Structure formats: C-alpha cells, structure tokens
Amino acid sequence: MDAPRIDAPRPNDLELGPNKYGDSESASSWFNPGALLSTSWDASSNIRRYIAERLSASCYIPSNPLFQQGSIMKKSLRERKSCKQRLPSAIVAGVKKCGGQQIYQFLRLHPQVAGTEKDLNFFDNVGYNDTSPEAYRLQMPYSTTKQITMDADQSLFQRPYNAPQLVRKFLSPNVKIIFVLCDPVERLLADYFSQWMKENSGLMNRDERVTFAMRFQASALDKTQTFRMDERNEFLDLSVYVQHLIRWLQQFTTDSILAVDGDLFKLNPASEMKKIEDFLGLRNFFRKGHFFNNDNTGQTCINFPQQFCPPRAKQHPELEDWATNKLCEFFKPYNDGLLDILNQRMSWMNNC
C-alpha cells in the first residue's frame, strides 16, 4: 500500500554531483512527499534514499552542502511530525586536538542525528547571562522523535571544573557522553603549536623554529618535573586524561561514557563510527567505503552522501627523540591509570 501523501515543501535543487553511490541529478527532480513516511534503510548507499531518509526523520529540508542544517519545514508540517527543540541526549565533550569536532561533523550527516551547527560552549557561561536549561534548549535544532539531539564542546572534558555536575544537572544522569582521546604527546604538541601560531602568524623560518622549541621546552617539558597540577600549564594538564575522567566518573556510570580512540579513527574511521552509532542506539549508517585519506593533507575525509574534507591542520615541528622520550616517561603512569579505569587499551598507548 502506498504511503499516505503529505503536503510538504519541495527541497531546494541539490546539485549533488556524481558519486559512486548515486546519481548526479537534483533532489527535487525525484522528490516524493510520500517518502516522508515510508523509507527503506539503503540510505547509506543511495543518495536518493539518503535524502528521503533525511526528509522523513528531520524537521529540515536538506540543502547544499549537506553538512548544513538546511531550511526549516513549515510550521504545520513540523507539528504533524512532532518537531520540537529538545535538550541534548548526547554530547561530544572533547578532547581538543583529538578529532572530536571532525567526528561530530560526520555524525551530523546521520539521518537520525540533529546536532548544533557549531560548538555552543554553553557550560563555559553558566552563571552568566541567561544560562538556564530552557535557554540551552532554545539553542538546539528542531528534532523529531526519530532523532537524537546532540551538542559538541571540545573543551568540556577539561573545563569548567564542575562540568560533570553541570551536565548532569542541566541534562540527565543518562545523557550519553563521548570523549575522543588521542596520543597525549601529539595532542600536547599540536595544541601548543596551534596557540603559538595564533600569536606568531605566518610561516616558520629556522630562527622561529628554534624559538618555538625553546618556548615549548620551558612551558611544557620543564613542567613535567612539577607534580602539583596547579603549577603545570594548561596544555600539559589536558593531556593527563585520567585526572579529568575521574571527575566525570564521579557523576556518570561507565555505561554513559564512550572513549573513542582518536588515533584509530584516522586509520579505520568506519570502525570507530560504528562504535559510536551502537553506543548512541543509532542504525548503522557509516560504511568503510564512505571514508578516504587525503594524500595531500593527511586528513580523513568522507565521500558519501557528499564529499567533505576538513581544513588542513598546520603541521608542527617534530620533537627530538630525547624530548619525546621525556614526555613519554611523564605520561606513562597516567596512561596506565587510564587503562585500568577504562579497561580499554588505546592504540596510541603503544607509541611510548
């Protein structure tokens, strides 16, 4: 029996471009409003079915590029689809420089995910202005009961210090929390270098590389001899994952927290995305063939439902072996503690 017809606005013509998973014609040339109520799950391999699934599950009409939220459906249709602005039931809470933002952008392509288009950093402002749960909810996208609402905040893992209590209070003890953890030495260096580049714009010549190395040694390497956390710098502190995870486990059970291996994501993104889908209770959408590695930038990219590569990160200078060894020696007991708590060996734990 044919699905009942719904009077819905037509999507904008999407010039989807040629793709091995579907045709290159525009969405409106085949759009059938009846698809809003009846779709089969081949949305991960066929661009037509993907658009139909987005239309069925979402409160927005897909636009080009598909990473954008799209245009909101008219009010009458939103009411019939029970569209509401809901508080997040899941959040990607870091860690900075470990790929969490990229993973979140990929997740937003899933038809069953309604996610904010940018980090709101809402919990940084609790206590200032209007930071009530209602104010937070009104910053969320509309979603249907077929979707989960998500937010991302790459600094939340570390700060504010009472972030676990705030998330539990504003959302729920059952909210799903995703942390992306990567090699702490590499994370530390990438974070420090990013800040250095903000203060010293432009390409680095030989003298500048020497200056960077000296500043890094003074700021980070020398601080590894300090055992008081409040005397270490922020870059070093954030890479001591276990101390922050303990605060989160005081408020949430292990069933509510997923630690994603950021280094493994670069090697096998489909596998890590499936772990996230299973954790969130989503249908499996992402496939191995969706991802590829950009040889020019080294970045993990996606080619379905539309090709997207994140901006290239600036490459930091390599550390000398003695410096790497010193940092490895510093982080090893903390990594061992993380292994004990998570009961999960990260691929990067073998780097030192």
Predicted ranges, named:
Residues 80-85, 221-231, 311-322:
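Short glycine/proline-rich turn/loop motifs
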Residues 121-123, 153-158, 234-235, 262-266, ...:
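Short histidine/acidic/glycine/proline-rich micro-motifs that form metal-
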Residues 99-112, 163-172, 191-194, 234-285, ...:
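PAPS/PAP-binding and catalytic site of the sulfotransferase fold
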Residues 246-336, 343, 348-352:
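The conserved 3'-phosphoadenosine-5'-phosphosulfate
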Residues 1-5, 10-158, 170-171, 175, ...:
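PAPS-dependent sulfotransferase catalytic core
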Residues 130-141, 201-275, 283-287, 329:
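PAPS-dependent sulfotransferase catalytic domain
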Residues 99-100, 136, 150, 167, ...:
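Generic structural signal for small/hydrophobic residues in well-ordered secondary structure
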Residues 87-88, 131, 135, 162, ...:
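Short, conserved clusters of charged catalytic residues that mark active-site
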